């Protein structure tokens, strides 16, 4: 009876998780596209209202004209739409699914005795600690390095090193399948933490300042933008980590940590290609094909590495 109920819980939670993830990723990708595609307004009325960018689009038989204000709009509308439940429900359903699939049966799915033989309670505690410790370390990197000269580059390198270390540890402590999923959950937890602890609180402070007739502190917009950009680069690595559970040849490799890092790097590079492609179409930057090339090359490198291992064992 228990296994039957767990199967149903797994199915329903997985379904809900996919639905909410699609909603979150869709809205996130749209706003990255929107920010990258805005052009200075031509209408003088818009300029006088403080509009810094506009976009004209056609979709579904209608024309759309979203605008972005440089600071605060002259007046807030009665119905102001917020984007946060997409993130929160994705994390809640994802962690629930992780609990049902891995933590509930830690001895079977989380632990591989040939990798590390430990008590299920200890493995569960360390798995949860992975989610929390990574977020704290990542947050400190953003705080301490983000405002320095070349801060974005320093943060990028710091976070990349942190992800590599976490990937190596996970693959040497847990079963390969669980390790890949855990790294995906770790990054996804950080993405939702960015929304809950920085993006939304900053936006609430901005709204409160406007309602009080006070100037808006630009630091909230800067911090929110920084974390939002990080989230968009985490997205494709997270998707690979989640989907890898269906392909045992990735996580069963002796150097599975290296395969995981290479594929996540490919995802981040490919995402960079699409982000910069919007600016290229407007003449703001060079063609981002090198990022696509790097991302695509990482995939056959991973394939070659996996194939070489299979050949040695045939």
Predicted regions and their residues:
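Hydrophobic alpha-helical membrane-embedded segments
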Residues: 15-42, 187-202
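Membrane-interface amphipathic/juxtamembrane segments adjacent to transmembrane helices
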Residues: 28-72
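Cytosolic juxtamembrane amphipathic/interface segments immediately preceding
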Residues: 66-82, 217-221
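Alpha-helical transmembrane segments and their membrane-interface junctions
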Residues: 91-106, 168-172, 178, 235-252
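Long, contiguous internal "core" modules enriched in hydrophobic/ aromatic residues
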Residues: 103-220
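Alpha-helical transmembrane segments
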Residues: 133-139, 266-276, 300-303
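Membrane-interfacial entry segments at the cytosolic side of transmembrane helices
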Residues: 148-157, 252-256, 280-296
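Conserved small/polar residues in nucleotide/adenosyl-binding loops
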Residues: 304-311
């Amino acid at each position: 009876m228990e296994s039957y109920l767990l199967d149903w819980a797994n199915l329903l939670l997985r379904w809900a998780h996919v639905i909410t993830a699609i909603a979150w990723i869709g809205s996130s990708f749209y706003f990255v596209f929107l920010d990258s595609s805005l052009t200075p307004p031509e209408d003088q009325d818009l300029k006088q209202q403080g509009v810094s960018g506009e976009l004209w689009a056609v979709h579904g038989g209608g024309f759309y004209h979203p605008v972005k204000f440089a600071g605060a709009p002259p007046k807030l509308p009665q119905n102001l739409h917020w984007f946060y439940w997409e993130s929160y429900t994705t994390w809640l359903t994802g962690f629930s699914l992780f609990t049902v699939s891995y933590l509930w049966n830690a001895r079977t799915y989380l632990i591989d005795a040939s990798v590390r033989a430990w008590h299920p309670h200890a493995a569960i505690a360390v798995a949860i600690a992975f989610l929390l410790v990574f977020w704290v370390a990542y947050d400190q990197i953003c705080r301490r390095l983000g405002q320095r000269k070349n801060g974005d580059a320093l943060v990028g390198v710091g976070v990349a090193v942190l992800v590599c270390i976490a990937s190596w540890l996970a693959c040497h402590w847990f079963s390969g399948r669980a390790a890949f999923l855990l790294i995906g959950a770790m990054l996804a937890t950080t993405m939702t933490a960015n929304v809950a602890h920085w993006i939304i609180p900053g936006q609430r402070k901005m709204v409160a300042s406007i309602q009080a007739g006070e100037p808006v502190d630009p630091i909230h917009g800067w911090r929110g933008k920084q974390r939002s950009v990080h989230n968009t680069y985490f997205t494709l690595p997270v998707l690979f980590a989640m989907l890898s559970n269906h392909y045992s040849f990735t996580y069963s490799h002796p150097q599975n940590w290296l395969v995981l890092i290479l594929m996540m790097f490919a995802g981040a590079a490919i995402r960079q290609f699409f982000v910069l492609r919007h600016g290229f179409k407007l003449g703001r930057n060079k063609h981002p094909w090198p990022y696509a090339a790097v991302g695509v090359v990482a995939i056959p490198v991973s394939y070659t590495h996996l194939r070489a291992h299979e050949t040695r064992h045939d």
